[in-house]
């Protein structure tokens, strides 16, 4: 358990990290996509030096890696802990003004001096947070708990291990850029992160342990038409916009993000751009089951084939499908101790594990493709990617306790 000074330092770290504008930029081709991520990476490098870690490195893409050898047994497992530097693209991360609310008494939470507020009427989980210390933003930005809380929790765990000389296995840490736009792991130096397994500290409520995620792909459908003066268009114009609308109607209406939950997969029309002469449709394909995932890709191909056979077209509709990431569970289940140890650590800390499937992806999914099992552990935060984002100090304390317990249990 953290003492008062360690808890204060945990909060101080987190609040300081939120002052860095690390919002990633959609459409970026290089990483890091924002200068603030490199600034935060350099700050973390200095903290790691002060904590006495070894092999500290910042890559040219702002990936920070470091190593803490075991103080018990050099042959103990090597466990990695990962968090990402960037914040989400959907909401500004500039000039974050965090506010600490001690002993939350329930009811609405006003954010700054504007009209934004967080209400238990919309967020039922607030009823469970009465009496806790909350951290929120001022209603103009997100808070950045996703994932600066994870960074603060990892750094604080390292500090506690050093201060108290607690027994621990070999530890590697990594802080990565551009997780929110899917670029960070493209430049991850796997050779500098040799682990038996790892954890991303990027989950939500206390107790969350996630080791399943969607299989994911992106499909791009291109439809070309023929423009013509509308007064003489009969039997000549081919309106790509009209064809695109009809194409979209070929998908099952009940298999969209807004109609699905749990382990149900979906098709998501994420972009619709163009004009009469040319339209591009971009779809996200998601499914937990590998066979179901492949069937979804076949479905889109069959829909394209049917249109090409039945419709009057300028040229055949084209389809490009690119896999994004796979369900990490295929790898995690080959390293069952990665889940078992986290479960045991949580229970020792008085937390009942909540096994959830991620309706999305994590850096751990990419690492799983490289053969490294990497479940996702809670941070204690809520409402990520939103002006209503918040986190509890108690939840952050719990995450630190779980990390230090995992590395202690691994020594035995």
Curated annotation (Swiss-Prot):
Principal location class: cytoplasm
Localization per Swiss-Prot or TrEMBL: Cytoplasm
GO-annotated biological processes: peptide catabolic process; proteolysis
Cofactor list: Zn(2+)
Keywords: Aminopeptidase, Cytoplasm, Hydrolase, Metal-binding, Metalloprotease, Protease, Zinc
Listed name of the protein: Peptidase T
UniProt-listed CDD domains: M20_peptT (cd03892)
Lineage: Bacteria, Pseudomonadati, Pseudomonadota, Gammaproteobacteria, Pasteurellales
InterPro entries for this protein: ArgE/DapE_CS (IPR001261), Bact_exopeptidase_dim_dom (IPR036264), Peptidase_M20 (IPR002933), Peptidase_M20_dimer (IPR011650), Peptidase_M20B (IPR010161)
Protein residues bound to Zn(2+) 2: 146, 180, 385
Entry's family note: Belongs to the peptidase M20B family.
Organism: Pasteurella multocida (strain Pm70)
Residues at which Zn(2+) 1 binds: 84, 146, 202
Cofactor notes: Binds 2 Zn(2+) ions per subunit.
């Amino acid at each position: 358990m953290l003492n008062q000074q360690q808890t204060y330092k945990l909060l101080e770290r987190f609040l300081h990290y939120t002052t860095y504008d690390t919002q990633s930029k959609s459409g970026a081709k290089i990483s890091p996509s924002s200068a603030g991520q490199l600034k935060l990476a350099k700050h973390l490098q200095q903290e790691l030096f002060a904590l006495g870690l070894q092999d500290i490195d910042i890559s040219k893409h702002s990936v920070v890696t470091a190593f803490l050898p075991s103080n018990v047994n050099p042959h103990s497992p090597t466990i990695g802990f990962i968090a990402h530097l960037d914040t989400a693209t959907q909401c500004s991360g500039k000039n974050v003004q965090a506010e600490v609310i001690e002993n939350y008494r329930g009811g609405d939470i006003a954010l700054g001096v504007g009209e934004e507020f967080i209400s238990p009427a919309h967020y039922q989980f607030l009823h469970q947070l009465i009496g806790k210390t909350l951290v929120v933003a001022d209603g103009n930005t997100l808070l950045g708990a996703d994932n600066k809380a994870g960074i603060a929790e990892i750094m604080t765990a390292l500090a506690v291990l050093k201060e108290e000389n607690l027994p621990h296995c070999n530890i590697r840490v990594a802080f990565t850029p551009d997780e929110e736009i899917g670029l960070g792991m493209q430049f991850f130096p796997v050779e500098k992160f040799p682990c038996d397994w790892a954890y991303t500290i990027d989950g939500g409520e206390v107790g969350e342990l996630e080791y399943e995620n969607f299989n994911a792909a992106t499909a791009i459908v291109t439809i070309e038409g023929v423009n013509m003066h509308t007064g003489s268009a009969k039997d000549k114009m081919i309106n790509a916009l009209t064809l695109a609308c009809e194409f979209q109607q070929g998908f099952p209406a009940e298999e969209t993000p807004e109609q699905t939950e749990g382990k149900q997969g979906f098709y998501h029309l994420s972009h619709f751009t163009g004009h009469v002469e040319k339209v591009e449709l971009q779809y996200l394909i998601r499914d937990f089951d590998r066979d179901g995932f492949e069937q979804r890709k076949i479905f889109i191909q069959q829909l394209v084939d049917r249109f090409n056979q039945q419709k009057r077209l300028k040229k055949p509709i084209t389809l490009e499908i690119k896999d994004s990431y796979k369900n990490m569970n295929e790898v995690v289940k080959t390293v069952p101790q990665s889940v078992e140890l986290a479960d045991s650590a949580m229970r020792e800390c008085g937390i009942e594990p909540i096994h959830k499937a991620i309706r999305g992806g994590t850096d751990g999914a990419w690492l799983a493709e490289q053969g490294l099992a990497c479940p996702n552990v809670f941070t204690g935060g809520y409402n990520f990617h939103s002006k209503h984002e918040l986190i509890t100090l108690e939840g952050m304390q719990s995450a630190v306790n779980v990390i230090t317990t995992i590395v202690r249990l691994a020594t035995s």
